[in-house]
Structures are given as structure tokens and as C-alpha cells.
């Protein structure tokens, strides 16, 4: 490199550091200033008594929650392990934005299949914001979805539908024990 390129690179680096130093205190203040939230998160409080099946659905006032199913499938040729998880996260909103594009809830789903014949875990994931009926989590009984991925509580079971590139799962799962808290 010649001296001009080194000088330009050094100036850019110094300017970047200066800009970061000037912006960092404001960014840190916004992150730590919980009073500026327009939509505060609900707190988990001791003594709350969960009521099932009502509490198996979404609680959108909380920051994060998830629905998780794991199990073994006894296929004729080999056993298969599976895992399905749907996450719901509520981002911190600093301003009232009536737009349907405003991400009030973020949905993330992950599914995996352990098939010994593949020699590795096969997995897929999806993410979307709620709205436009593309993703969501219902309050009350469990019903979470992203596009055509679904986990839904029926009367005495859960139905899961995962259509991924390398695998698909269509499951009906029944609880074998009461909820474990």
C-alpha cells in the first residue's frame, strides 16, 4: 500500500471511532431507559396460578414465550427423533405506529428430525412478524403458526404440521402426563 491509502484508511477508522463514541451514550441510554417504552412488558409475579388449558395459549403482554414438542417416532425401519418449537417475541416499541408493517409480535419456528441414516440433524426454521395472517399466536388454547407451519391444540391432543425442504412432519401428539411446572 502506498502512504495515501494508509492515511485514508486511518482517517476513516478514526472518524468511525469518533462517531461511535458520540452515538454510544445515546444508544445506551435508550436501551436502559425503560420509562420510554410505549408498551411495557408484563412481569412474571410470584404466586400466579396457571390455569389449563387457558394458559396454554399466547400471553402477548409478556416479552417472550415458546411452545416446544419433542418425541420419538417408531418408524418401521428405524426410530426418528423430532423437535418442534415456536417462539413468540414482543419487540420493544418506542413509538405508536399504526402501520400493519409495525412488528408487534415476532414469530420464529424451528423443527428438527434426527435420522441416523442421514448422519446429521436435519432442521429448518422460519421467522415472520404477525399480521397479514402470515404468522401469529392465539391467546387461550394453543394455536401458533408461520405460513403453513402450525401447532394447534385440539380437544385432547396437539396437531403439528411442518413442511420443510428436506422433511415434513404431520403429527398428532397426545400428552402422557399433566403439565410439569
Q: Residue ranges of each PLM-predicted region?
A:
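Targeting-peptide/extracellular-domain and disordered-appendage signature
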Residues: 16-17, 30-181
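Generic cytosolic/nucleocytoplasmic N-terminal low-complexity/intrinsically disordered segments
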Residues: 1-4, 32-34
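N-terminal secretory signal peptides and thylakoid transit peptides that target proteins
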Residues: 2-20
Amino acid at each position: 500500500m502506498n502512504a495515501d491509502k494508509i492515511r485514508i484508511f486511518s482517517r476513516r477508522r478514526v472518524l468511525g471511532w469518533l462517531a461511535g463514541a458520540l452515538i454510544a451514550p445515546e444508544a445506551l441510554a435508550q436501551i436502559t431507559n425503560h420509562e420510554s417504552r410505549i408498551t411495557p412488558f408484563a412481569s412474571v409475579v410470584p404466586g400466579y396460578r396457571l390455569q389449563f388449558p387457558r394458559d396454554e395459549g399466547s400471553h402477548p403482554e409478556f416479552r417472550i414465550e415458546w411452545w416446544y414438542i419433542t418425541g420419538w417416532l417408531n418408524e418401521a425401519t428405524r426410530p426418528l427423533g423430532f423437535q418442534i418449537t415456536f417462539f413468540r417475541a414482543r419487540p420493544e416499541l418506542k413509538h405508536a405506529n399504526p402501520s400493519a408493517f409495525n412488528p408487534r409480535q415476532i414469530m420464529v419456528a424451528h423443527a428438527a428430525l434426527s435420522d441416523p441414516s442421514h448422519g446429521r440433524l436435519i432442521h429448518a426454521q422460519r421467522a415472520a412478524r404477525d399480521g397479514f395472517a402470515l404468522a401469529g399466536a392465539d391467546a387461550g388454547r394453543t394455536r401458533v403458526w408461520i405460513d403453513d407451519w402450525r401447532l394447534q391444540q385440539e380437544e385432547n391432543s396437539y396437531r403439528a404440521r411442518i413442511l420443510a425442504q428436506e422433511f415434513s412432519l404431520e403429527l398428532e401428539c397426545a400428552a402422557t402426563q399433566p403439565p410439569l411446572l
